[in-house]
UniProtKB/Swiss-Prot annotation:
CDD domains: AAK_NAGS-ABP, NAT_SF. The gene is argA. This is Amino-acid acetyltransferase. One of its GO terms (biological process) is L-arginine biosynthetic process. It comes from Pseudomonas syringae pv. syringae. It comes from the Bacteria. GO terms for cellular component: cytoplasm. Residues 286-425 form the N-acetyltransferase domain. Belongs to the acetyltransferase family. ArgA subfamily. PROSITE patterns: GNAT.
Length: 432
């Protein structure tokens, strides 16, 4: 079977979920200048064709720098914000205007044999961003550099309702007719908040947020962001992360940071369970909870391969349905990726930890430890003093977590009478 068939099947829930949602996408000037820009445009057109309401915000910093260099003007910054004098503003207007026209032209392409054939998009931009001057900070006059005051929510939504892609540039206008140079991150964040967007998607050079070892941080809560900002210091990755967290605090459900250099990064982030960048979200992307009857199918998908390998004791659907209240599960984007069960043992202060299983693709994220802690807490709440576990393959894992070797003789009689000598499981116990 072709690989794309499986991909479409796995992507179909996301295709349905994203339809009629509002996404604000921020692409910095470096991303527009990158060779992968054409692929990003194709991916945006695909999102539009799938019913996503798109607002695209572009940056222009390198393009402005180029104009300044041509005129022999030295750029000035304070706190990584450009100081925009009159000469610089002329360069900003020139660069932004030309870049906006270039993006509109790319989105308007209708080339035979291209991903955009027949798309016939309508791209609209205008004076929908009202701005005000930053003014003087720490004795520095930012002059024509401004900040977003508001966006025209009704006007933009009307365009989105009519199936336009709305293109926002990093320029804002005051009621008195002044023009202000804006940070595209500020425009995108405020647009996402004011439009009550479902997602804010921020493009950067990196795959997403990387930790101290260079590993991708896949998910964060807004309250976890300040610690990472302190570690990152003053760099563009920190700006993106700060914008993502601000949007979430402002009511945007999810913010994503993806790479403009990686072909297909946007689609991977939106249409696969684990994505390819960093997600900042108020709600939990992955949830540890008590199992419900609706989870039986997902539990069977998880444990059946392990039963076939002899790692777990076989359980029929009927048994799972009857014992579902004993289970705790880890759910990730609707998929049950881990489980464990607690069985109190009659006429004793003991319980059995059973059916601890983690999807092979997620075995290095501490989910087993998380479930073990949850089971131990449940056991304590039930007055259980000793926790038993029977295993054939994972003895060392339990030993490393405080379980001691035990025997059938140590099992309460109600459980000892059910011991399967043919399976010959090793027995461990832990005082809790």
């Amino acid at each position: 079977m072709p690989e794309y068939v499986n991909w479409l099947r796995h992507a179909s829930p996301y295709i349905n979920a994203h339809r009629d949602c509002t996404f604000v996408v921020m692409l910095p000037g470096d991303g527009v200048a990158h060779p992968n820009f054409g692929n990003i445009v194709h991916d945006l057109v695909l999102l539009h064709s799938l019913g996503v309401r798109l607002v695209l915000v572009h940056g222009s910093r390198p393009q402005i720098e180029s104009r300044l260099a041509q005129r022999g003007i030295t750029p000035r910054y304070h706190r990584d914000l450009r100081i925009t004098d009159t000469e610089t503003l002329e360069c900003v207007i020139d660069a932004v205007g030309q870049l906006r026209i270039s993006i509109e032209a790319r989105l308007s392409m209708d080339m035979a044999a291209s991903p955009m054939q027949g798309s016939r998009l309508r791209v609209t931009s205008g004076n929908v961003v009202t701005a005000r001057p930053i003014g003087v900070l720490e004795g520095v006059d930012y002059q024509h550099t401004g900040e977003v005051r508001r966006v025209d929510r009704k006007g933009i939504n009307r365009l989105l309702d009519e199936r336009h892609i709305v293109l926002l540039s990093p320029l804002g206008y005051s009621p008195t007719g002044e023009i202000f140079n804006l940070a595209c991150e500020d425009v995108a964040t405020r647009a996402a908040i004011d439009l009550a967007a479902d997602k804010l998607l921020l493009f950067g050079a990196e795959t997403g947020l990387l930790d101290e070892q260079g590993r991708l941080v896949r998910e964060l809560r807004p309250q976890q962001v300040p610690a990472h900002l302190q570690r990152l210091g003053a760099n563009y990755q920190a700006e993106l992360l700060d914008a993502a967290a601000e949007a979430c605090r402002g009511g945007v459900a999810r913010s994503h940071i993806v790479s403009y250099a990686e072909n297909g990064a946007l689609l991977t982030e939106l249409f696969t369970r684990d994505g390819g960048g960093t997600l900042v979200a108020q709600e939990q992307f992955e949830l540890v909870r008590e199992a419900a009857i609706e989870d039986v199918g997902g539990l069977m998908d998880l444990i059946t391969p392990l039963e076939e390998q002899g790692i777990l004791v076989r359980r029929s659907r009927e048994v799972l349905e009857r014992e579902i209240t004993q289970f705790s599960v880890v759910e990730r984007e609707g998929l049950i990726i881990a489980c464990a069960a607690l069985y109190p043992i009659a006429d004793s202060e003991s319980g059995e930890l059973a059916c601890l299983a983690v999807n092979p693709e997620y075995r290095h994220g501490g989910r087993g430890d998380e479930l073990l802690e949850r089971i131990e807490n449940r056991a304590r709440a039930l007055g259980i003093k000793t926790l038993f576990v029977l295993t054939t393959r994972t003895a060392h894992w339990f030993r490393e977590r405080g379980f001691e070797p035990s025997s059938v003789d140590r099992l309460p009689s109600a459980r000892a009478s059910l011991y399967n000598y043919q399976r010959n499981s090793k027995i461990f116990e832990k005082a809790i």
